[in-house]
């Protein structure tokens, strides 16, 4: 809804164009600086990123994986750093492959006695990995295993041995967001299963069978394991995975099978006494960003209990308390990150800490790591305007251990907005650039506003950025290098909505988009735009829409349903659910949301397909995608681009060579960001 003062002709006439449209033809992608309206407030030094944490058992040493991002925001060179938690100089572990891209350490894990820190290291330019170990003094690491394939989720077992998830002869990195292997030869025959393996005498002994892909695992005190697993293609079949028990040398039994196609399971944890397994279950659109309710399984009886049924929050990670009598939950409750203690004996969870900051290293996982014997925890905290730092201490009473980013700020006003859409109270974030500060009234305007009206604020453009998933959420993260930063530096406001289908308001809210893609969630987003216009001086004539993955789909969909946006940028979108079903490498994720395959019920797929309504598009739209994206394959972008080209709608399509669903090459990320900004600037320029 537009506020009345926005119609003032004098005000509209005074708004300068950001850039003449002729300067940004569709075939030219200048740097963002060439067109930014205000001067960007770039930090004096890079924003250091902390990607993983591991505390030694005695709590005296914190290991981390960290690095500085490129100008595009990608952290391509990563280091392992050790710091005494009591303070003191940090030590960097010298990696044998050096400080080069793809020399990627991961899976930090301390031995039970704290004398060894083991980790996985990828060999640059290959899918081969190795296990190495150092000590608390960051001594030169020694190799424990060289492996022809991928290794993930390394961890020490209570007996001092190492376990890992291993994929022999892997033809790609683990995960559907990684670039897919070339689709050549006989289809469906090149299947590589990821298995639980134990390092013993310089080699791996497999503890899970060769016909199952194991996604996550946890050790049992008797030497066995529990984990989530499914047969066949690991990228595709996580959505039908079951909770299983594994006994060496490879026996598997089912402990829990999801009760419906719209229930996925993740984050299995074993209690200290080995009698109970806890896990997260709920509808999840992606492996990695877990979310749902907390469940408990009694191993003796097989009884399964939902411990958080009906909660208005989403459990994103869980672990047993050090005493084993409760679960420690990492939750998202609308705009707040919450750490809660949930008694296993029953009762309501007790909130240990709640904040509107983001907690934890990386983009998904627990809010903190801990050393039970020492009673100390460590976390990474950040907000939209405050950069990440590592903090240590008791939960909620942390103090900064690092100061690398101290002094770096970003002048943005972040507002958590809540608006009504149908029966839902939808939450989102509105980010206002430093140029949005309203003019200060003089004394006469302040004390006699009836006779001397205060100055009107300048209207500012706004980009709505729709998150992927859809089972995910926009959460606070420091605005360092990246697309959001470019928009704000250009003087644009940014709206980050969390429509129905998102995490943060309980399982019923996350399930509210089942068989309704593009309808209720789009209403939520459009009502969010209205709410932003009531909360800030947003220019309704210069609204943009963008998103990646499901956000890319919503962008393609929205321009077939409304002409409200002046321009749109669809990243890795989906234009036709019917053709998409047979093109992507993860089609199992669609059954939970559509209720049946496209071959059984094509109509439910057609009603949510942008291509069904493609002749309604009038919005200039840029489409981009990675060449080897198996989650949202390039033909979906090509189909949308082809349709708009035939219909005479201004459009541009870009396919980035060799990239998967998540782009990695800094030059591609930089091109995408600059291209996106230039697209909005071009189409905003003649809308003032």
Regions found by a protein language model. Give the residues of each.
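Beta-strand-rich domains and repeat architectures in extracellular enzymes and scaffolds
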Residues: 42-78
């Amino acid at each position: 809804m537009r506020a009345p003062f926005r119609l003032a002709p004098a005000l509209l006439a005074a708004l300068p164009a950001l850039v003449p449209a002729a300067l940004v033809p569709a075939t030219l992608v200048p740097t963002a600086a060439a067109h930014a309206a205000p001067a960007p407030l770039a930090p004096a030094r890079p924003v250091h990123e902390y990607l993983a944490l591991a505390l030694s058992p005695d709590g005296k040493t914190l290991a981390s994986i960290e690095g500085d991002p490129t100008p595009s925001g990608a952290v391509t060179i990563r280091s392992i750093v050790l710091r005494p938690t009591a303070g003191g100089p940090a030590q960097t572990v010298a990696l044998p492959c050096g400080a080069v891209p793809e020399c990627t350490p991961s899976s930090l894990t301390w031995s039970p006695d704290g004398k060894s820190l083991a980790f996985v290291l990828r060999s640059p330019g290959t899918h081969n990995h190795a296990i190495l170990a150092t000590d608390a003094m960051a001594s030169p690491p020694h190799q424990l295993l060289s492996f022809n394939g991928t290794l993930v989720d390394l961890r020490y077992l209570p007996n001092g041995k190492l376990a890992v998830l291993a994929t022999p002869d892997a033809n790609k990195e683990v995960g559907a967001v990684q670039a897919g292997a070339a689709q050549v030869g006989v289809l469906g025959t090149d299947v590589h299963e990821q298995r639980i393996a134990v390092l013993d005498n310089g080699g791996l002994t497999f503890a899970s069978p060769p016909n199952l892909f194991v996604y996550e695992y946890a050790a049992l005190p008797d030497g066995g394991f529990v984990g989530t697993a499914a047969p066949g293609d690991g990228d595709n079949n996580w959505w039908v995975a079951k909770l299983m028990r594994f006994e060496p040398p490879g026996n598997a039994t089912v402990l829990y099978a999801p009760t419906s196609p719209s229930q996925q399971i993740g984050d299995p944890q074993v209690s200290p006494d080995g009698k109970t397994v806890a896990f997260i279950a709920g509808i999840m659109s992606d492996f990695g960003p877990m979310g749902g309710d907390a469940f408990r399984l009694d191993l003796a009886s097989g009884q399964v209990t939902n411990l958080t049924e009906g909660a208005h929050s989403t459990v994103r990670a869980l672990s047993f308390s050090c005493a084993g009598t409760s679960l420690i939950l990492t939750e998202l409750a609308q705009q707040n990150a919450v750490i809660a203690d949930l008694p296993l004996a029953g009762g309501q969870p007790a909130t240990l800490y709640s904040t509107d900051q983001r907690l934890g290293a990386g983009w998904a996982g627990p809010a903190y790591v801990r050393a039970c014997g020492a009673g100390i925890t460590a976390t990474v905290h950040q907000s939209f305007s405050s950069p990440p730092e590592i903090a240590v201490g008791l939960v909620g009473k942390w103090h900064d251990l690092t100061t690398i980013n101290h002094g770096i700020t970003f002048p943005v006003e972040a507002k958590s907005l809540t608006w009504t859409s149908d029966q839902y109270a939808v939450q989102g974030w509105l980010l206002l650039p430093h140029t949005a500060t309203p003019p200060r009234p003089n004394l006469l305007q302040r004390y006699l506003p009836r006779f001397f009206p205060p100055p009107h604020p300048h209207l500012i453009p706004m980009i709505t950025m729709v998150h992927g998933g859809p089972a995910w959420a926009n959460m606070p993260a420091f605005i360092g290098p990246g697309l959001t930063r470019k928009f704000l530096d250009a003087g644009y406001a940014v709206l980050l909505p969390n429509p129905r289908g998102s995490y943060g308001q309980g399982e019923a809210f996350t399930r509210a988009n089942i068989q309704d893609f593009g309808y209720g969630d789009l209403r939520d987003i459009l009502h969010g735009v209205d709410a932003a216009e009531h909360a800030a001086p947003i220019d309704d004539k210069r609204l943009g829409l963008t998103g990646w993955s499901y956000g890319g789909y919503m962008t393609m969909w929205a321009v077939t349903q409304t002409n409200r946006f002046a321009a749109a940028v669809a990243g890795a979108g989906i234009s036709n659910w019917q053709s998409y079903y047979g093109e992507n490498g993860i089609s199992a994720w669609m059954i939970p949301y559509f209720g049946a395959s496209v071959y059984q019920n094509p109509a439910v797929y057609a009603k949510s397909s942008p291509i069904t309504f493609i002749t309604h598009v009038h919005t200039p739209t840029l489409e981009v995608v990675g060449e080897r994206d198996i989650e949202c394959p390039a033909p979906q972008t090509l189909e949308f681009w082809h349709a708009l080209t035939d219909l005479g709608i201004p459009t541009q399509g870009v396919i980035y060579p060799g990239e998967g669903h998540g782009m990695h090459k800094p030059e591609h990320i930089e091109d995408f960001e600059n291209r996106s900004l230039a697209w909005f600037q071009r189409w905003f320029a003649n809308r003032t």
